[in-house]
Design a protein with these regions (language model features):
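Aromatic, loop-rich ligand-recognition surfaces of beta-strand-rich domains
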Residues: 1-38
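Beta-strand-rich extracellular modules
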Residues: 17-21, 137-139, 156-160
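Beta-sheet-dominated interaction scaffolds and their linkers
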Residues: 39-76
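A short beta-turn/strand-edge loop motif at beta-sheet boundaries
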Residues: 76-85, 96
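Short beta-strand and strand-turn-strand segments in soluble, beta-rich domains
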Residues: 96-121
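Intrinsically disordered, low-complexity Pro/Gly/Ser/Thr-rich segments with frequent PxxP/GP/PP motifs
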Residues: 116-143
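Short glycine/proline/serine/threonine-rich loop/turn segments at secondary-structure transition edges
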Residues: 140-152
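Beta-sandwich strand segments
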Residues: 144-147, 160-173
């Protein structure tokens, strides 16, 4: 038997029971369930564990390079008859709280190094997922980024037509 769900399943409680027979492969690839605590329309993003995008900056005598190049979509918990406009912007005021919660000591990444493309997304009427994706990368003279603890850039989602998820409303780069 094969079952696939594309999109979202709306349920107050979700129970997943999987039974295997001895003649069937016992491989289960991946199941991720994210709980969004809100009964009101809420926007959120899902990008791996704890909405964290990682990458590295490599310093060489000839200059510095970065492998940071990621993208993510925005989602809504409730479809709207008029759709949603979701904005994504860096919010370095969240770095201290992140460091405290995760026992880290990242420095805030200055906006001059952050390249956000397509930072305003549209979730169409009746849809749950944005039509496009935000693309994020690093730009500029990266040789000045030398903090050995690393850097953090919180990318906060916001929408005038919906709330923002407390747990999944920020993507951390």
């Amino acid at each position: 038997m094969y079952a696939a769900f594309y999109g979202h399943i709306e349920a107050r409680y979700l129970r997943l029971t999987i039974g295997f027979s001895s003649s069937w492969s016992k491989t289960l690839s991946e199941i991720d369930i994210y709980k969004i605590d809100s009964e009101d329309p809420t926007v959120y993003a899902v990008t791996g564990t704890e909405n964290l995008i990682t990458g590295k900056i490599t310093h060489r005598q000839t200059g510095s390079t970065s492998d940071v190049n990621a993208s993510f979509s925005a989602y809504a918990t409730v479809a709207s008859t008029s759709g949603y406009t979701v904005s994504v912007a860096a919010d370095n005021s969240l770095v201290a709280a992140y460091n405290t919660a995760h026992d880290t000591s990242y420095a805030a990444l200055s906006a001059e190094y952050l390249q956000l493309d397509n930072s305003t997304l549209t979730i169409a009427a009746g849809a749950y997922k944005s039509e496009g994706e935000v693309t994020v990368s690093l730009k500029g003279d990266l040789t000045r980024l030398g903090d050995l603890n690393g850097y953090l850039a919180p990318l906060k989602l916001s929408s005038s037509g919906a709330g923002t998820s407390a747990g999944r409303g920020v993507v951390y780069l």
